């Protein structure tokens, strides 16, 4: 049923009264508008929505359908990666002279491209109208008049995580385009004379995705992220009086509470006790800090693109370093020096108690450093209006410039930043400040040697005092034609702006490479604690199917031995998450013998003490399937003195990693070895003798690929085994 509204406009004070669907405003200069289409999203739970004027229903596509409290009744949440509503409407319903669109939006993330809230356009037909958002949260109106493409963009950005009422009027008849935000006109532009172009017959429409089509690599980048409600299309012109009347139909919007109850119950690869965002892409962790009973960790985040583009700062919190909850993103690119992305950085509690961060901003041409501050324990951050405090890299480096890490020592803030010199190798540059505002460049703190395999660029540097006067200096070499990205470190002293290493050649952090870019902090008990990223290294298609990419490690505790080697153990807080204990007991293991353990699981901790006996190899099997033959084999090889992570038979999918990785490690045949294994969906973490650590990822396809076993080759051994299920 067409909703008919007759408005009489006043040039002075508005005194309104209502009679059914008629509003009178001082009865001056009548204007007629009609409601043509409406989506109110008040359906209770099914996977479709109804357009109320025609009664037609349309499916909601995407990974899951999440309804939430809206402006009036329910609203619909769009994940920014997969959710959209598509259909067609009869073109005869749509006017070609004047049209007004009203909708309520609460964006969670801004897009990489131009995301549509409502699109009635077609990439090929050169017709229609689209109302959406760009990467800065500005309202974008795209439309065709007499087949010619036109675009109007607001100078004002709408806020994230808060309801905003958007009204857009397009009138070739009066040659105007008007954009209202919360009933206030924020943009008024010209439109060419002519007629709004519509296709003949039916007009395709999309809610939550731009029908014009926009991609970056393998991913579409025009999905809307956040909540939408009360989408209405009117004939007639949008004026301040019309905006006031439409807005007056609604009360004051409440706080936004997104329904992020994404159903991962059918995803065997999703972890339950490793830190991971609700969905989307994640990268390096940093800024791990403890404040007033809560741990905060920040990370590279993108909810609307599974890769590097328009990164922002994600935020996780935890009471104990194990059970993490995602909070709202705290830093977002804005026009200017950080418009192309907020890259990594560090968090620090300033000497006056202010929670602060320092971060890398990029504008598309160069990187600089800026700061931001919090007045609510890191729930929000306010950028420093003087940013960038360091606008560009020093002249003596000629590669990238990013990833600041800061400490306070001897009355100064000391900051190192990753960089490099192409002809020499990776390095970190060094700055100091008395007030966290004015920074003095002090030169290159430490220069690597590209000829020694140390890479040409270093990222994610760490300078951490692990014991009295003894520092860890850790960097990550970026991948090159000699080796992948890998973390290595020196230990030594840091005095008077100089780091003096205890040994010449760096040590690798991992036995088998797979754990990168650790965030390092002191926990509430004074222990050095680290959490890093464990990439999935699967295809973009597989990531798109999952709806997320990468995750973070369980917390580790680091100590140093006398030789300056970092000893790595799982954090003791993990013990609190142990569930059922399964005592396997003592096992005698013979070469070729299988089914030594009667246990199946995807989320558990296994502690095994091996008496390695005469075996040439000893290890364990995960993700074992009787139906497909899939299995993930992890073992120590005495003949090569290596730990081996063999994923060659771990999956029947061609979209995931199925490689074999090795890492040198010295063990004596016949010795006793304690191995602590954490399995959580697709991720593996192994701790050896409470000293060393390595990781892996595996993605079996079969439903029964959850078998666990121990094995030996070339001799015999024994093991004492206890398994705990892990609950979270």
PLM segments and residue spans:
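Glycan-recognition/cleft segments
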Residues: 116-142, 195-197, 621-648
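Beta-rich carbohydrate-recognition and catalytic domains
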Residues: 242-403, 407-454, 465-511, 534-587, ...
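Extracytoplasmic low-complexity segments
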Residues: 21-82, 123, 187, 201, ...
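Extracellular/lumenal carbohydrate-interaction signature centered on repeated Trp-anchored short motifs
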Residues: 30-35, 89-101, 123, 155-164, ...
């Amino acid at each position: 049923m067409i909703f008919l509204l007759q408005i009489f406009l006043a040039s002075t004070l508005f005194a309104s009264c209502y009679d059914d669907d008629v509003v009178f405003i001082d009865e001056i200069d009548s204007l007629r508008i009609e409601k043509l289409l409406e989506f109110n999203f008040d359906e209770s739970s099914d996977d479709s929505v109804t357009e109320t004027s025609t009664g037609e229903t349309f499916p909601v596509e995407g990974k899951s359908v999440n309804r939430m409290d809206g402006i009036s009744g329910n609203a619909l949440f769009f994940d920014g990666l997969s959710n959209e509503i598509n259909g067609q409407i009869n073109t005869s319903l749509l006017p070609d002279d004047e049209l007004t669109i009203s909708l309520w939006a609460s964006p969670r993330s801004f897009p990489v491209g131009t995301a549509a809230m409502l699109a009635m356009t077609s990439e090929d037909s050169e017709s229609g109208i689209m109302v959406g958002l760009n990467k800065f949260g500005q309202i974008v109106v795209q439309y065709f008049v007499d087949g010619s493409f036109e675009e109007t963009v607001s100078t004002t950005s709408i806020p994230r995580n808060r309801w905003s009422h958007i009204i857009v009027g397009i009138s070739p008849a009066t040659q105007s385009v008007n954009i209202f935000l919360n009933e206030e006109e924020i943009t008024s532009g010209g439109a060419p004379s002519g007629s709004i172009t519509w296709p003949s017959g039916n007009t395709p429409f999309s809610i939550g995705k731009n029908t014009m089509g926009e991609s970056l690599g393998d991913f579409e980048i025009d999905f809307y992220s956040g909540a939408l409600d009360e989408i209405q299309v009117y004939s007639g012109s949008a004026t301040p009086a019309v905006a006031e009347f439409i807005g007056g139909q609604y009360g004051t919007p409440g706080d936004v509470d997104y329904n992020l109850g994404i159903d991962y119950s059918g995803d065997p690869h999703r972890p339950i006790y490793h830190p991971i965002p609700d969905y989307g892409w994640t990268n390096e962790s940093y800024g791990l800090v403890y404040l007033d009973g809560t741990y905060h960790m920040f990370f590279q985040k993108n909810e609307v693109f599974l890769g590097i583009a328009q990164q922002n700062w994600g935020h996780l919190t935890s009471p104990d370093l194990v059970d993490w909850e995602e909070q709202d993103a705290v830093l977002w690119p804005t026009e200017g020096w950080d418009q192309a992305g907020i890259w990594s950085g560090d968090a620090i509690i300033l000497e006056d108690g202010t929670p602060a961060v320092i971060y890398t901003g990029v504008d598309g041409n160069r990187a600089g450093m800026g700061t931001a501050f919090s007045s609510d324990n890191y729930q929000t951050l306010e950028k420093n209006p003087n940013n960038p405090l360091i606008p560009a890299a020093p002249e003596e480096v000629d590669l990238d410039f990013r990833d600041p890490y800061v400490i306070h020592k001897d009355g100064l803030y000391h900051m190192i930043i990753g960089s490099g010199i192409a002809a020499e190798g990776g390095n970190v540059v060094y700055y100091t400040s008395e007030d966290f505002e004015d920074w003095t460049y002090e030169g290159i703190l430490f220069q690597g040697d590209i000829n020694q395999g140390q890479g040409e660029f270093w990222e994610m540097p760490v300078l951490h005092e692990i014991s009295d006067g003894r520092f860890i200096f850790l960097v990550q070499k970026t991948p090159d034609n000699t080796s992948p990205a890998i973390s290595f470190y020196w230990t030594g002293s840091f005095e008077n702006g100089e780091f003096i290493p205890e040994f010449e050649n760096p040590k690798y952090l991992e036995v088998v490479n797979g754990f990168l870019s650790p965030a390092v902090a002191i926990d509430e008990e004074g222990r050095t604690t680290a959490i890093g990223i464990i990439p999935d290294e699967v295809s973009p298609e597989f990531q798109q199917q999952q709806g997320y990419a990468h995750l973070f490690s369980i917390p580790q505790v680091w100590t140093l031995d006398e030789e300056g080697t970092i000893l790595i153990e799982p954090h003791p807080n993990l013990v609190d998450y142990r569930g059922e204990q399964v005592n396997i007991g003592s096992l005698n293991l013979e070469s070729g013998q299988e089914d030594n353990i009667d246990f199946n699981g995807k989320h558990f901790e296994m502690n095994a003490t091996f008496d390695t006996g005469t075996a040439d190899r000893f290890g364990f099997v995960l993700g074992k399937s009787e139906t497909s033959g899939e299995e993930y084999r992890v073992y120590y090889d005495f003949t090569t003195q290596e730990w081996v992570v063999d994923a060659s038979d771990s999956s029947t999918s061609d979209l995931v990693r199925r490689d074999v990785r090795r890492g040198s490690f010295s063990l004596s045949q016949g010795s006793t070895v304690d191995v602590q294994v954490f399995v959580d969906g697709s991720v593996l973490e192994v701790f050896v003798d409470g000293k060393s650590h390595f990781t892996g990822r595996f993605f079996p396809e079969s439903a029964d690929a959850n078998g666990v076993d121990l094995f030996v080759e070339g001799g015999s051994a024994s093991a004492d085994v206890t398994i705990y299920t892990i609950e979270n």
